[in-house]
Swiss-Prot record:
Belongs to the RecO family. Involved in DNA repair and RecF pathway recombination. Keywords: DNA damage, DNA recombination, DNA repair. This is DNA repair protein RecO. The keyword DNA repair applies.
Length: 246
């Protein structure tokens, strides 16, 4: 059966001498594994459309356990990202996140569109990269059914507290009276909570130039790092570690 769909290449690895094994996040059939035969040959018609980050139109043949790329036409290669190692590393982190959170064969158009908009924004020199990354992380978790609860205590429902903490295990805020339910919870201030809620509520185009205090960035980053680690069951993202060293 032939399927026509657009998609983002999340991963491309060498398979044999001339083939590529791909992980593609498609709009029509979700995340899939696919083989692109002969794609590593320099004159292959498939070469440009199967590079990591490529946003391409695909004609796919669905086999018993694997898709085959019959045709592909790149729509966006994101050359600007490839010319800046830090932006490239952050963009690769987005792809790692998407691959980690999605199930094979399950579509998620909100996440698909979010990835496209974010990669396009990351091409711009004037954007606040850290702000965009935090917004993407929050929205990715929301669109995957893992939105953190940030409006009241997840245990008792209290909407005000002398001292808030964030529990990754419980999935959100815990007030000062409920701190004991999670010994690994992280202290979080009201401004960080407000920032997280703002990033969840606004679209990426509104967020792109938002300047945030470095302390708030670090505070939200600490919370989200633990939250993602717990819910995606993943400790490290290689591309993010590379970006931090640059």
């Amino acid at each position: 059966m032939l399927i026509k769909t657009e998609g983002f290449v999340l991963r491309n690895r060498k398979y044999g001498e001339t083939d590529s094994m791909l992980v593609i996040f498609t709009k029509k059939v979700g995340k899939i594994n696919a083989i692109a035969k002969g794609a590593r040959r320099t004159k292959s018609a498939l070469l440009a459309g199967v590079q990591p980050f490529s946003y391409s139109d695909f004609v796919l043949f669905k086999g018993r356990s694997l898709y085959t790329v019959n045709q592909t036409e790149p729509k966006e290669i994101f050359y600007n990202l490839r010319e800046d190692v830090k932006r490239l590393s952050y963009a690769a982190y987005l792809l790692e996140l998407v691959e980690s959170v999605t199930e094979e064969g399950q579509t998620n158009n909100r996440l698909f569109n979010l990835l496209g908009r974010t990669l396009h924004l990351m091409k711009k020199e004037e954007i606040e990269l850290e702000t965009i990354l935090r917004a993407f992380e929050l929205k990715l978790m929301e669109y995957s059914g893992l939105k953190p609860h940030l409006t009241s205590c997840v245990s008792c429902g209290q909407t005000s507290s002398n001292s808030w903490r964030f529990s990754s295990k419980e999935g959100g805020l815990i007030c000062h009276q409920c701190h004991g339910i999670d010994s690994f919870s992280i202290k979080i201030n009201v401004l960080t909570v407000k920032l997280a809620n703002y990033l969840l509520a606004k679209d990426m185009e509104e967020i792109q130039k938002l300047k945030v205090n470095p302390y708030l960035h670090e505070s939200l980053n600490k919370v989200l790092k633990q939250y993602i680690m717990v819910h995606l069951d993943r400790v490290n993202f290689n591309s993010l570690e590379i970006a931090k060293k640059i």
